[in-house]
Amino acid sequence: TADAIGADYCHDECPGVAGTPDAVAEVTSTEQAAAVVKLCAEAGVPVTVRGAGTGQAGGSVPVSGGVVLSLKAMDQILEFDEAACTLRVQPGILLQEVKAEAEKRGLYYPPDPGEKTATIGGNAATNASGPNAVKYGTTRDYVASLTVVRADGSTETLSGADLESVIGSEGTLAVITELTLKLIGKPKADAILLFPFMDTETCLNAANALLAKDYAPAVVEYMDTDIVEFSGNVTGNPVFPVEMDGERVGATLMLTLEGEDDDSVMEKMEEIAELAEEIECLDILVGDTPTMKREFWAAHDAFHTSMESGAKNAIEYNITVPAEKIAEMVEYAKAEGEAKGLKVMAYAHVGSGGMHIHAVSDGEKAEFAAKVIELAALIYGKCSELGGSIRGEYGIGCAKKQHLGAEALDKFSALKAKYDPKGILNPGKAAD
């Protein structure tokens, strides 16, 4: 209860969002979770579900007080079904542990959001995805079934179309207590290609041109040179090109190709190399050894953490826009950020349209906080104008809910009335 509650239960990774629960209930089974929710429903007490607390949108923060239902101890692998190629797990197991278990069995769990220490339940609650969504899709595509606790404390097993009422609902419609995940065969061979370009527009035009062809890349990643340079300086391990032949690179495209064997991957690489002049890239750099591939991904995965450690103030805006609108969104965010005295940098998963826009400053915290609130309204407004979604990969939480449109609010209200009429599950989040 209150006096013994640690600070970790009062926040996630979203800056400026905090809340103090009245109690924390750590559970290890569906039955225990159901009992807690039933008691809270009868008493009208809010329930905020929490996994690892790695969210970026305030989704697991108890902004309305009440009870934090911690699922972190529900971290067991329950069953591997070899015939169905599925893995049944509890929600508190970490993404990296699910991936390792699949790897151990010679299989592959594709969803690959940046935070590997997030829980698998949190991934399902936000429908997390990552760079390889262009080929493999999102978490939703790899959930065969769920066991959930509804807002009245009843339990239910869901599959097929019924999963839509829970996956991506951010703990506002049900508590996920068990997941059966689909595993697939591992890619047998792969390689990474880097394409530096003089500017963002040329880079993204090339990305869309390559996507239109029959190469089926697993990753098509846009990286602007500002973020490449900033991150490389912070980590002391610059990997991606910043200059070529004395000229500053504008942006780099990272492409991952997969195939049945090395020869099939090489064939794709050779076909793409023939397009170098057409797509106006400055060069093509190849990563086809385990060491090079690890270095490329380590440099890419350092973007987020380097913002936090390399600047006095940092914030991220995570959105999704149509692939053909990414260049316009990048230029808009940079211009608006610059007008406010902020340095704005970006990278994006081109195939799925997922964007990570970072703003940093070494100014005063209060001034930065005011500026990034203004910038958020501009970025989210532009995102909607371009036909995108502010949900992105991190969800809405409480950080973005004020920017949702009337249509999204109405749709959510109808679901909330159906599944949680008392409004006890994760109040103040998503469209609540």
Language model features by range: what are they?
Residues 5, 11-74, 349, 383:
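Glycine-rich N-terminal segment of FAD-binding domains in flavoprotein oxidoreductases
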Residues 384-396, 421-425:
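Alpha-helix capping/hinge segments and adjacent helical runs
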Residues 40, 171, 357, 420:
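Conserved, mostly hydrophobic/aromatic
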Residues 76-83, 87-221, 425-426:
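FAD-binding subdomain of flavoenzyme oxidoreductases
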Residues 400-432:
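Activity-critical C-terminal alpha-helical subdomain
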Residues 4-11, 181, 185, 194-375, ...:
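C-terminal substrate-recognition/cap domain of FAD-linked oxidoreductases
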